[in-house]
Amino acid sequence: KYFFNKLSEVEGPEGITAGGGYWSARISYLLGNAKEANYFLKKAATKERTFYGSLAMASLGYKYKPNFDLPKYDNNLINKILKHMGGVRALALIEVNEFYKAAREFRKIIPKFDLKDYPQLLSFTSKNNMPGLTFRLAAILRNDHNKILLGGLYPVPSWKIETSDLKDKALLYAIARQESGFNPRARSSSKAMGVLQIIPSTAAFIMKNRE
């Protein structure tokens, strides 16, 4: 219990401190100290965007309503994009649904934008089916500037998915976010490929085609 208590107090990743608080609460409850358990649950619940923070909030009966709204982008942003040849190419590629190639063009010109433009850029890339770039921009704002835009950190791609047998799109998006950051060209040293980082031999086994 001592180590979980200390873990809840350290300055570090929110997921770690929330886990320390949650397990301190569990142990305190089992030891019959409800007041202390409540204290640590409340402490963990302040990290509502983490797994253990969510568990703590549920244990306390709190309701969490995340805001996934992104700011609207305006014509000023479009004009800034058009000032760069890469931006012109990106807009042209969007017109013909070449979103991955458009995102590659955008990555080259992102450093030319001011930080204050990033929220609108997030909105633009999200609306135009560039989840990987949206996620990366949102991560920069979170990691370097402590600005949280949940709509950017958890983008919803406009993928054409056959939904007849798919029960949970959110799970598919979560795997894509974790495994590849929505990068369709991602490859690992173990030969895993694509947004879901599927290993060809595994795919062949599942499809019963090992030729």
Which positions does each model-derived feature cover?
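Structural signature of alpha-solenoid helical repeat scaffolds
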Residues: 12, 48, 77-78
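Long, contiguous interaction/recruitment modules in multidomain scaffold/adaptor proteins
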Residues: 49-53, 58-67
